[in-house]
A protein has these predicted regions:
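Conserved ABC transporter NBD signature motif
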Residues: 67-83
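Conserved ABC ATPase "signature" region
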Residues: 105, 109, 116-134
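ABC ATPase "signature
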Residues: 222-223
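A short, flexible loop at the N-terminus of ABC-type nucleotide-binding domains that lies
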Residues: 2-9, 15-30
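Conserved catalytic motifs of ABC-family nucleotide-binding domains
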Residues: 159
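Catalytic Walker B motif of ABC-type/P-loop ATPase nucleotide-binding domains
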Residues: 163-167
Length: 251
């Protein structure tokens, strides 16, 4: 991990307005933070805290009401930056009649990747996400976990420097969640910068180097997970653990 910032956010505010231009919802309020090169950074907060809005602002899908964003050395409004970004939305909107190979080839074409490189990247990514056995099955036959994995492979087809993951473990069973976390750790090992958002502390605790806690569109805490858990903060962390007897009973 380097101290070089890949993302710089300064006083970012996003206000949604109604048809008449009246203030309806303030999704973000004066958010300021940096994401360092090579780290896995987590945005943690409940639904409606501003996590997905932040993701969309980074991608340039939304425009801020106030504030500035620099991403990979360019403003968020510069679409050329997207060539170096991979994005996994909370719901993977993929063509269900295509198989895994066809899906990755299709998205590779959108990035103008050559046929030879598309084939190589497709094979590498299918192996990376563990879908060799299902590479020629239509996506409509995939489980939720398999769909998330091919969605991650799609996000990596352009070999991005920055990967944005919106609720990557959403809807996954414990085994699927562990597989996704392993893949995120693999991305860190390869030098990728990852920003993921989640409403689950366990998700960010297992993989993130640092986290930002959002609530009501405002930044409440920022730092390493272990430091935030040890120190006294305004934000309270409530965790629960099942005892061995309870686990045995569930089994």
């Amino acid at each position: 991990m380097s101290d070089e910032p890949v993302i710089q956010i300064r006083n970012l505010t996003k206000t949604y307005r109604d048809f008449w231009g009246r203030k309806k919802v303030q999704a973000l309020n004066s958010l300021t933070l940096d994401v360092k090169k090579g780290e896995v950074f987590g945005l943690l907060g409940p639904n409606g805290s501003g996590k997905t809005t932040t993701m969309k602002l980074l991608l340039g899908l939304l425009f801020p009401t106030e504030g500035e964003i620099s991403i990979l050395g360019k403003p968020a409004s510069d679409v050329s930056k997207n060539e170096r970004i991979g994005y996994l939305p909370e719901e993977s909107y993929l063509y269900r009649f295509l198989n895994a190979e066809e899906t990755l080839d299709f998205y590779g074409r959108l990035f103008d990747i050559t046929a030879e490189e598309r084939k190589q990247r497709t094979n590498e990514l299918i192996e990376m996400v563990g879908l060799q056995h299902a590479r020629r099955r239509q996506l409509k036959e995939y489980s939720k976990g398999m769909t998330r994995r091919i969605g991650l492979a799609q996000a990596l087809i352009n070999n991005p420097d920055l990967v944005l993951l919106d609720e990557p473990t959403s809807g996954l069973d414990p085994e699927g969640s562990q597989d996704m976390k392993r893949l995120i750790n693999d991305l860190r090992d390869k030098g990728k910068t990852v920003v993921m958002c989640s409403h689950l502390l366990a998700d960010v605790q297992d993989v993130c180097d640092r986290i930002a806690i959002l609530y009501g569109g405002e930044l409440k805490e920022l730092g390493r997970v272990e430091d935030l858990l040890k120190e006294q903060h305004e934000t309270q962390f409530v965790t629960s653990h099942l005892g061995d007897e309870a686990v045995d009973e569930i089994k």
